[in-house]
């Protein structure tokens, strides 16, 4: 039987567990504002705004200047490296702006996906080199949690056993390194919604991927109470001809989680995966109304699904900043309700909130 060499002290474990629980306190979720410079280029070009460092700062300021209404629905904000060191118009660092609201600051630490040779276009994620040193610095600079994204895709031949195993192991290495530095790792194995597969196929693949991830986390002695999971919801592929209800998506999603995610994990913060703002809220709401026991907080870690209406309202104009911030607050509040199963739906069929945010082969 393997011996246990304690990786973390009782104090370290308590700190990690406390941070994780703060982020997913009832009715709270995560704003993912960690789009890379390249991803911001796509967002800004949609509204005809040049992708400069100053414009990226101004856009992040729209989100981060939200008033105290967001305290009750946002538990954490994921920053990109550049944003972590930017300030608002008054010279106040964004990190302090967020911390002063009692919101936990997080940082994206992976360095993007790279091809896995010998596979059918599958990938792994790079960024383990120097990660411990970067985590130590980020912790000093105010970050208490981190995010690392792995990507898997569903096709006839994928995900392969190799891709599942490699990505599970890289997530576990990342998680272990974060915890050694007092940072809560968000483990993100995203199964892309590309393809014409049905709900059952996505559920099956999600179960296989999550089972591998938690096996790897155990192998690497990761302290589960000090982690969060950021999975896809179980949904059909974007090209699937069958339309499923939020209730069907919720049942498939919660069933997959119940079969694979230990109850020691404090929270599951779903990615929105290109769903429209409204769809992402309705599905999260249905998940929290699902009639199965759910031992974890089930909440959101949304990027596009919290930002699309705000971006549309802003359009790079200073005069629109206030209105854009209001749009963000509205989505944050809606998702805070959905995370408690208390959202009744907007009744809006049109408008920005109903626009699909799907991008094929999405890479940040």
Curated annotation (Swiss-Prot):
Which NCBIfam families does the entry link to? FrucBisAld_I (NF033379)
N6-acetyllysine modification sites are 111
Q: Which lineage?
A: Eukaryota, Metazoa, Chordata, Craniata, Vertebrata
Enzyme class at the top of the EC tree: lyase
The further comment given in this record reads: In vertebrates, three forms of this ubiquitous glycolytic enzyme are found, aldolase A in muscle, aldolase B in liver and aldolase C in brain.
GO molecular-function terms, A-Z: fructose-bisphosphate aldolase activity
Q: What is this protein called?
A: Fructose-bisphosphate aldolase C
Q: Which GO terms describe its biological process?
A: fructose 1,6-bisphosphate metabolic process; glycolytic process
What does the record give as EC number?
4.1.2.13
Q: Which reaction does it catalyse?
A: beta-D-fructose 1,6-bisphosphate = D-glyceraldehyde 3-phosphate + dihydroxyacetone phosphate
Q: Which residues form the active site?
A: 188 (proton acceptor), 230 (schiff-base intermediate with dihydroxyacetone-p)
Q: In which pathway does it act?
A: Carbohydrate degradation; glycolysis; D-glyceraldehyde 3-phosphate and glycerone phosphate from D-glucose: step 4/4
Which family does the similarity line name?
Answer: Belongs to the class I fructose-bisphosphate aldolase family.
Site positions (Necessary for preference for fructose 1,6-bisphosphate over fructose 1-phosphate) are 364
Keywords recorded for this protein, A-Z: Acetylation, Glycolysis, Lyase, Phosphoprotein, Schiff base
Q: Which residues carry this modification: Phosphoserine?
A: 36, 39, 45, 132
UniProt cross-references to InterPro entries, sorted A to Z: Aldolase_I_AS, Aldolase_TIM, FBA_I
The Phosphotyrosine modification is found at 5
Tagged with keyword Lyase: yes
> Residues that bind substrate, according to the entry?
56, 147
- What sections of the protein cross the membrane? none
* Subunit structure, interactors included: Homotetramer. Interacts with ATP6V1E1.
Which superkingdom, per the lineage?
Answer: Eukaryota
